[in-house]
């Protein structure tokens, strides 16, 4: 099982395909907005092989014409995201439970 470095890659691919764009077209449109990204790097992003900083998510949403929230998958459980987000992995954040409030 591959360890995903981002959760938005498949959504980026989905919205790019819905527009009928190649990776080259999307990369060029991102470059015109000021993000120097190569086709190879975009391919790695879509394949979940590279991390995506928050500022890049904003660029992607703007160019694809979608909200930033729409780039994130709908999940019912952290298990859907993969083992790196489950117990035993690194914690992303710790929120108090009702009993701790």
Annotate each PLM feature.
Residues 1-19, 28, 99:
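A short, Lys/Arg-rich alpha-helix, primarily the initiator
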Residues 2, 62, 72-101:
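Short, charged recognition helix plus adjacent turn
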Residues 7-10, 21, 25, 37, ...:
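Residue-level signal for the short linker/turn that defines the boundary of a DNA-recognition helix
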Residues 12, 16, 26, 60-61, ...:
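Hydrophobic packing within well-folded, soluble alpha/beta domains
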Residues 20-44:
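Short alpha-helical DNA-recognition segment
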Residues 30, 46, 56, 72-75:
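DNA major-groove recognition helix of helix-turn-helix
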Residues 35, 49, 80-81:
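Short Asp/Glu-rich motifs
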Residues 49, 53-70:
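DNA major-groove recognition helix of helix-turn-helix/homeodomain DNA-binding modules
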């Amino acid at each position: 099982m591959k360890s995903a470095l981002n959760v938005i890659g498949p959504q980026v691919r989905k919205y790019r395909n819905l527009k009928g764009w190649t990776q080259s077209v999307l990369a060029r449109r991102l470059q015109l907005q000021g993000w120097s990204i190569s086709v190879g790097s975009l391919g790695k992003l879509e394949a979940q092989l590279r991390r995506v900083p928050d500022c890049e998510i904003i660029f992607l949403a703007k160019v694809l014409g979608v909200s930033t929230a729409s780039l994130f998958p709908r999940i019912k459980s952290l298990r859907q995201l993969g083992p790196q987000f489950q117990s035993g992995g690194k914690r992303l954040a710790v929120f108090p439970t009702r009993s701790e409030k």
